[in-house]
């Protein structure tokens, strides 16, 4: 009897197997765009239809094609016929665990638990996505928080922008990434394990390998001091040539790009000669720096909107910064944009990045206005935040344009961003991977 029951059960399962094996119906979404900037750098292509299957663009057609006429009767239709539609934006320099710097954030760094910082990071990620930035490159935090957030987003456990993450940034002892700067010697080990600090080529090779072992997507280093470094050591070179070369060579062994925090020209030149992929901030660029950018093909990420964060923090609390840091803040505000004015006409490759965490998360698009103020056309600024930033991140096959095969990450605005980049501050619609995240278009 038992054998008979088992036989019947196996027969029933076998009969059901084809049904169980059937793939789910594809999810089709059709977007009708009033004006489509599918490939920034080119003119808008006018009224268009974007066909999306399971989160990927499969087709772009001229005109507003009905779902049935497109061969997808019953598909979801998103009506953006009164909007400019363009690819999701890319911010290539954010710090999702951080908020505007100052005395408070210094205290929070040692008071907040990693769990509390993780919730902050998730909230900041959602603000960023809501602002139309569907991809970000996170350039430094501690405790592996953004690495975990990156993985959670990729697995679909939480909603946020796609994240490319550098883990913990590397510098020398007493360099910009030394988290215990400004604290007593006896507190240094209690505050941080300092495994992101290296002195000498061999130590720097090991430090890179530690970051790779933790699963980072790229390496971030500092070759100069930083504005928010809690010492008055200036913004010049703080790493030797052989240390920078050792870092780049080791990163290359593992197929990792290298992004470099550098303000002073000496640190910029050191990094470019070492073969890095991008310079972040690049506040002072002399003629030799610009020639090296052109020669090496490295990217320049100017992070102009940090000045907004500084100005807002000072307005809220004139004593937010120590005298040593305030002097650097005032200098950064004074010279911001001067290097971009020189770099753009010379053909230096520029990618969009804000340093959000110094400036406010969710206001990433403020950078566009400053890029235009300091020498870029609206079209160039938009390319920097789409095609160019995607290339810098190694994601040209996934992001930056709306073409068949790429992720269906798109945004919509009222008004032409090629005439007025400030419309990008008011994104009314955000879709990531074919799923609507934000829709405030009204009736």
Q: Which residues does each predicted region cover?
A:
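Active-site gating loops and adjacent loop-to-helix segments of metal-dependent hydrolytic enzymes
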Residues: 97-117, 173-193, 227-240, 296-333
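Histidine/acidic-residue-rich catalytic or RNA/ligand-binding cores of hydrolases
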Residues: 100-104, 146, 175-176, 229-231, ...
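His/Asp/Glu-enriched, well-ordered alpha-helical/loop segment
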Residues: 109, 253, 257, 321-324, ...
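Alpha-helix-loop-beta-strand connector modules within alpha/beta enzyme cores
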Residues: 151-169, 235-260, 301-305
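Metal-associated gating/positioning segment near the N- to mid-region
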Residues: 83-157, 173-178, 242, 266, ...
């Amino acid at each position: 009897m038992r054998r008979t029951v088992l036989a019947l059960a196996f027969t029933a399962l076998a009969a059901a197997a084809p049904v169980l094996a059937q793939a789910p119906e594809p999810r089709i979404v059709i977007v009708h765009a009033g004006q489509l900037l599918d490939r920034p750098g080119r003119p808008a292509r006018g009224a268009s239809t974007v066909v999306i299957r399971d989160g990927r663009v499969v087709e772009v057609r001229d005109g507003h094609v009905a779902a049935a006429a497109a061969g997808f009767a019953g598909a979801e239709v998103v009506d953006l016929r009164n909007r400019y539609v363009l690819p999701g934006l890319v911010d290539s320099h954010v710090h999702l665990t951080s908020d505007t710097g100052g005395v408070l954030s210094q205290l929070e760094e040692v008071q907040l638990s990693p769990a509390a910082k993780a919730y902050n990071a998730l909230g900041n990620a959602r603000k960023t996505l809501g602002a139309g930035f569907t991809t970000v490159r996170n350039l430094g935090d501690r405790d592996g928080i953004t690495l975990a957030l990156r993985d959670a987003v990729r697995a679909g456990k939480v909603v946020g922008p796609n994240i490319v993450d550098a883990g913990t940034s590397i510098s020398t002892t007493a360099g910009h990434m030394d988290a215990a700067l400004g604290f007593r010697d006896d507190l240094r080990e209690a505050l941080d394990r300092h495994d992101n600090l290296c002195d000498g080529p061999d130590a720097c090779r090991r430090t890179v390998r530690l970051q790779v072992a933790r699963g980072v997507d790229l390496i971030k280093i500092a070759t100069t001091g930083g504005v928010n470094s809690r010492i008055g050591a200036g913004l010049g070179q703080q790493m030797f040539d052989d240390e920078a070369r050792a870092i780049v060579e080791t990163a290359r062994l593992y197929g990792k790009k290298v992004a470099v925090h550098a303000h002073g020209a000496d640190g910029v030149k050191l990094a470019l000669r070492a073969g890095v992929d991008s310079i972040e901030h690049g506040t002072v660029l002399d003629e030799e720096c610009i020639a090296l950018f052109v020669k090496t093909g490295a990217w320049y990420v100017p992070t102009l909107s940090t000045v907004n964060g500084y100005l807002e923090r000072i307005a809220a609390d004139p004593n937010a910064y120590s005298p040593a840091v305030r002097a650097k803040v005032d200098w950064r505000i004074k010279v911001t944009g001067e290097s971009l004015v020189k770099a753009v006409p010379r053909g230096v490759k520029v990618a969009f990045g804000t340093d959000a965490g110094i400036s406010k998360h969710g206001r990433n698009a403020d950078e566009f206005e400053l890029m235009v103020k300091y020498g870029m056309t609206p079209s160039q600024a938009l390319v920097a935040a789409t095609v160019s930033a995607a290339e810098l991140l190694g994601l040209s096959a996934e992001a930056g344009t709306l073409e068949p095969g790429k992720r269906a990450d798109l945004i919509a605005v009222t008004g032409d961003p090629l005439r007025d980049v400030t419309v990008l501050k008011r994104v009314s619609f955000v879709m990531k991977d074919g799923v609507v995240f934000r829709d405030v278009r009204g009736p």
